[in-house]
């Protein structure tokens, strides 16, 4: 285990970004690395402000009925324990399925909102967050805001805002955050502060003078825009609507499986943050732009008391990940903030622990970061460990920031589903096109929950199964007295020969685990399902049988990319209800629809 804790390595950012001695460069994929972190980069705020309200605040109550297409539940099957030493669960659980308490279609084919309709990019890159009264969804480069039944609204799933480009949150901010509408934007609800966090990466290098504002010089405050000037977010403008395509034609789809063209060696990238000033996502936002030296792909934000942690990949052709954290305390009050990053070579996609609930880690506790073992670019498709790091951030003295690890946690052997990402994997009925599985990575979210006298971390990824399908490998780790994760239980959910993959997990206030995932195969079009377990159940089993959220009605034939990720969110109103979003195809559709659903596991109810 290597520890970086050397003051002489720190260089404060005086230009667009600061790279430390021995800092981050793109790594030759043929050169194995030891997964240790580089020294810390410190990024100053390029610009920040407080926006005008995003849209008109609406408290209107709707009595219009909601139509949910909820599908039948699988029949009850007798329970058997897995054989000793075998973590693959080949039969369903013996408990009734989780109760579906809400279900409606989100962004995608068939969606219409106050700003009309839109075309949606592939993959969907689904992101979902849930607050006291609202649900916010982002699909690749579009966003929408929905009602949530409760004190303010009498119905769930009514669109209040959208579909709009995600960059609409940055209208009036200037620079690349306003000008460029890239995909992979992600939303989180910070339950500890009742705020909404939107993170949007900028994928193209910033080279023109209009975009490249540069970071502040030493001693110079971050640039601020005037609050509420014309052109800042107000009522959203209707998106341009192209004319309808001729009959029997399909819209052009960019082949996202082809490698991106090489970027010029000049210019930097940017990461854009918007943090709401209150619990209403239609209100104003504190907005920030940071520049980064490395390509900021696939961000996976996580809420932790001392920061918002946002790891990113640096591209599909390199084995190098950027692990960053931004100063949450400063951002919550709209103050000038910094971002600290390290580079970790030779590792798969990283995920940082994301807090579920309001029971926080002990003061000063480091954030836990994890990745699957193996490396697809080295053709290492299997392993028997999960890698873990401890990220200690020091905002007063960044020289003391360090990332300890990796710790290699032994787990049951696994093989990446279909050998990793961008592979022809999941078959579909009557179609030659197979779908991608993203089998090389732990999926968002990496869940942290403090319940009772212990602290748990839940992780999921997609693995091959004995029957030749795909299964959801899941883990619960617990932190020991040294704050190191130790395996508590694990399992692979594969009750038949179908494919279950692209999972996302959550843990409710009772310590119950719920997992949503895509389901499909040669006999079934891809849809969305949900399974789980109670904290008191036998270890290593998902005892709560599958609930069906959405059943696919057609095959996706225009691209192999499927979702890239799904997402869960725990409802802050009761700390029990688990929300989930994923894709499915309607009959005759040429692109995806998304289904948003809410589940409640047995025995968890009531306000927190």
Predicted features and spans:
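Bacterial N-terminal signal peptides that target proteins for export
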Residues: 2-10
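Bacterial N-terminal signal peptides
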Residues: 11-19
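C-terminal PAP-associated
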Residues: 25-232, 240-246, 251-608
